[in-house]
Amino acid sequence: MTFSGHTARKRFGQHWLINERVLDRIVEAAELQDGDRVLEVGPGRGALTERLLASAAAAIHAVELDRDLVAGLQQTFASHPKFSLQEGDVLSVPLELSGGVPANKVVANIPYNITGPLLDRLIGRLDRPVDFSYQRLVLLVQHEVAQRIRARPGHSNFSALSVRMQLLGRCSHVCPVPPRCFQPPPKVQSEVICIDPFPPERRPTAALSRGVERLLKMAFLSRRKMLRNTLAPVGSTDLLQSLAEEAGISLQQRPQDVAPEAWVALAKGLNQVDSVA
């Protein structure tokens, strides 16, 4: 490698993943096959890049913000026929491979302070879908965020984020990543997760998505209160009871007990009422 003298920069949130087993698990989770085109976010010093290039994937397109690292990556991998590199902010630069061809899988060891915005760009939001759906994303994120993304109804970590993400794709745990797996070690625990985004036809419609967002904002504002209280602005008690029965839930439940699909059903009933009113 040609990164001698380069130290991790705090302003970029840099922590190099150095644990070989975790690096291998990330590549395994991506299930790379012949023809796959991979977008690697934050290649850093290239430890994961090297493994991706050795996989069956057809192309690896890396996006790196740190100019010094870009120079090292170019020097190390530029001669590899499967490698291409884009310098810039992953939140704003084009993410397509050369020739405008989109990647179909994403592998990312991202600065934790851009996790939310990056997920918005790669997967979209309920109320703002993306035009293109990746087949799989393997992401190294802060453990606390991972817990919220994949938490199931009834768990203390189940939140509005859980509902949103699980309506956008299938979210699963890959492996824990303790601080000692990085150089320098971060102050928080980390986790590798896998997200398989749903195609557009499996996602809630735009109208339903707006309804779900409206309900989530009301309900999780006071997550410990029962739905009969948090959803009171929706309408009368009788209306709420009717909508809840149609959605298969109880107004005695708390927001964290309601499954993502039930929020969609509740939004559908509410939209029907609004269209008649």
From Swiss-Prot:
Q: Which GO terms describe its cellular component?
A: cytosol
NCBIfam families xrefs: ksgA
Enzyme class, first EC level, given as a word: transferase
Q: Which PANTHER family match?
A: DIMETHYLADENOSINE TRANSFERASE (PTHR11727), DIMETHYLADENOSINE TRANSFERASE-RELATED (PTHR11727:SF7)
* Family label: Belongs to the class I-like SAM-binding methyltransferase superfamily. rRNA adenine N(6)-methyltransferase family. RsmA subfamily.
According to the UniProt entry, the coiled-coil residues are none
Put simply, this protein is called: Ribosomal RNA small subunit methyltransferase A
The lineage's top-level taxon is Bacteria
The species this protein belongs to is: Synechococcus sp. (strain CC9311)
Principal location listed in the UniProt entry: cytoplasm
Q: Does the keyword rRNA-binding apply?
A: no
The signal sequence is none
Q: Which reactions does this protein catalyse?
A: adenosine(1518)/adenosine(1519) in 16S rRNA + 4 S-adenosyl-L-methionine = N(6)-dimethyladenosine(1518)/N(6)-dimethyladenosine(1519) in 16S rRNA + 4 S-adenosyl-L-homocysteine + 4 H(+)
Kindly give the SMART domains that the UniProt entry links to this protein: rADc (SM00650)
Q: Name one GO molecular function term.
A: RNA binding
Q: Which UniProt keywords apply?
A: Cytoplasm, Methyltransferase, RNA-binding, rRNA processing, S-adenosyl-L-methionine, Transferase
Q: What is its EC number?
A: 2.1.1.182
Q: What does this protein do?
A: Specifically dimethylates two adjacent adenosines (A1518 and A1519) in the loop of a conserved hairpin near the 3'-end of 16S rRNA in the 30S particle. May play a critical role in biogenesis of 30S subunits.
